[in-house]
Amino acid sequence: MSQVLGKPQPQGEDGGEDQEEDELVGLAGYEDGPESSDAELDSGPEEGESRRNSWMPRSWCSEATRHECWEPGLWRSSHLLGIGGGWRMLRRQRQADFFLDFSDPFSTEVKPRILLMGLRRSGKSSIQKVVFHKMSPSETLFLESTNRICREDVSNSSFVNFQIWDFPGQIDFFDPTFDYEMIFRGTGALIFVIDSQDDYMEALARLHLTVTRAYKVNTDINFEVFIHKVDGLSDDHKIETQRDIHQRANDDLADAGLEKIHLSFYLTSIYDHSIFEAFSKVVQKLIPQLPTLENLLNIFISNSGIEKAFLFDVVSKIYIATDSTPVDMQTYELCCDMIDVVIDISCIYGLKEDGAGAPYDKDSTAIIKLNNTTVLYLKEVTKFLALVCFVREESFERKGLIDYNFHCFRKAIHEVFEVRMKMVKSRKAQSRLPKKTGATPNGTPRVLL
C-alpha cells in the first residue's frame, strides 16, 4: 500500500488548488511565503534578459540561449527562441563597448562558466550547436572552424543558468598577452573534447597543460573529458580508446605530482543521446540544489509506485536531476523522444484559433503507453522544467494518487525556486553596494555586513 505524501486540507469555496496547504513528508519548513506565486516562479530570466516569440506557447517555447562571439570592442548577439520543430532564430547584431567584470564574486556563483576546449576540428562547436541550438547533426558538417572566443548564455530555468565559452583550437590562451587567470578564476567546469578517431597524443599533451594551469588558478574547477566522435567506432574499440586515454591522462598527472586532480571521462557523439547525457552530468555538478532535488524525486517515486523519474530542462533536454536508481541509456532516450514529440505537437496544435492564449499551464500532461506495459507520464513543473516518469500500467491505475503526490512535489520545487531567487536577488543587491573603506570613528576597521 502506497503512502500518500501529504494530507489534503479542506478547500475554499472555489475548490481551487491555490488554497490547498500540503505537507511533504520528510521536508519540514516548506510553507508558502507571502511572496510565493506561480507567476514569479515561472518568470524564468529576469526582465530584460529574455524575449518570447508571440506565436509560440508561453510555457514551453521561450528563449533558450543568448549567443555572443567576442572580438575586441565588439559583441555579436543573436537570440534563439523556441524548441523542437518550432525553433526560430531572431538574429540581430549590435556594436557596443562590453567589459566583463570577472572580479565580481557574486556573478560567478549566480551564473558559472563552462569552458569548451580542445584541438581544432575536435567537435566543440558541433556539440554546442546540437545541444543548445537544436541543429541537426548532419548540418554540423558545414560548420566553419571557430576563429574567435564565443560566449553563450544559457538561462532556461532558475536551476539551469550558466555560460558556455567556446575556445578556438588554434588559440594559445597561455600566451603572455592572454590573461588566462581571468578566465579560469570564475569557471565552474572545463570540458576538454578529444577526437577519438584521430591521433590523440597531441590532444593529451594539451589536456595536461590546460588542466595543470587551470588547477593552479582555481582548484574548484570540475574537469570533464569528452571522448568524442565514438559513433564510428566499434564497442570494443570504444572501451579500449577510453581505457587508453584514461590511463595516459592520469599517468601524466601522477608524474607531475597532481594525483588529487580528478578527471571525468565520457564517450560522446552528436548522432545519439550520449552528448545530452554527458552534458546533463556536467551541469548537475554546478547545481547546488541537486541533493534537495534528488531527495524530492526519491520521496515522490517511493510513494507513487513509479519506477524512474527525470526532471528535465525541456529546452536543452538536459536532465538536471533524477532519482537514486541507475540511469539506463534507453530510458533516457525515450524521455528525450517524448519531449520532442510533445513539444512539436504543442507548437502546432496547442494555440487557439487566433494564435493567442497559453496552451500549457500547471495542469498540462502527456501520456504515452508503450507495448511493454510501461507508461510514459509527463507533467509540467514550471515553464522550463518537466517531470517525465516511467510507470507500470498496474501502478498507473492509481493516477489520482500520483497526481496528488505530484502536486506536493511541484509545490516543494517551487519553494526551492523561491529560495534560489531570493538568494540571487540578495547577492546582486550586495554586489551593487559601494565598498566602504577606511576606519570607523573609534579607529576599528570598517566591516560591510
From Swiss-Prot:
Region (Disordered) location: 1-55, 428-449
Regulation: The activation of RagD/RRAGD is mediated by a GTPase activating protein (GAP). In high-amino acid conditions, activated by GTPase activating protein FLCN that stimulates RRAGD GTPase activity to turn it into its active GDP-bound form. In response to amino acid depletion, the GATOR1 complex inactivates RagC/RRAGC by securing the GTP-bound inactive form.
Molecular function as annotated in GO: GDP binding; GTP binding; GTPase activity; molecular adaptor activity
Keywords: Cytoplasm, GTP-binding, Hydrolase, Lysosome, Membrane, Nucleotide-binding, Nucleus
CC annotations in GO: cytoplasm; lysosomal membrane; lysosome; nucleus
Recorded catalytic activity of this chain's protein: GTP + H2O = GDP + phosphate + H(+)
Broad EC category: hydrolase
Binding site for GDP: R121, S122, G123, K124, S125, S126, T140, E144, T146, H228, K229, D231, S269, I270
Residues that, per the record, bind GTP: R120, R121, S122, G123, K124, S125, S126, T140, T146, G169, H228, K229, D231, I270
SUPFAM superfamilies documented for this protein: P-loop containing nucleoside triphosphate hydrolases
Top-rank taxon, per record: Eukaryota
Tissue localization of expression: Expressed in the distal tubule of the kidney.
CDD domains given in the database record: RagC_like
Protein task: Guanine nucleotide-binding protein that plays a crucial role in the cellular response to amino acid availability through regulation of the mTORC1 signaling cascade. Forms heterodimeric Rag complexes with RagA/RRAGA or RagB/RRAGB and cycles between an inactive GTP-bound and an active GDP-bound form: RagD/RRAGD is in its active form when GDP-bound RagD/RRAGD forms a complex with GTP-bound RagA/RRAGA (or RagB/RRAGB) and in an inactive form when GTP-bound RagD/RRAGD heterodimerizes with GDP-bound RagA/RRAGA (or RagB/RRAGB).
PANTHER family listed in its UniProt record: RAS-RELATED GTP BINDING RAG/GTR YEAST, RAS-RELATED GTP-BINDING PROTEIN D
Quaternary structure, from the entry: Forms a heterodimer with RRAGA in a sequence-independent manner and RRAGB. Heterodimerization stabilizes RRAG proteins. The GDP-bound form of RRAGD (in complex with the GTP-bound form of RRAGA or RRAGB), interacts with RPTOR, thereby promoting recruitment of mTORC1 to the lysosomes. Component of the lysosomal folliculin complex (LFC), composed of FLCN, FNIP1 (or FNIP2), RagA/RRAGA or RagB/RRAGB GDP-bound, RagC/RRAGC or RagD/RRAGD GTP-bound, and Ragulator. Interacts with NOL8.
Name by which UniProt lists this protein: Ras-related GTP-binding protein D
Native organism: Mus musculus
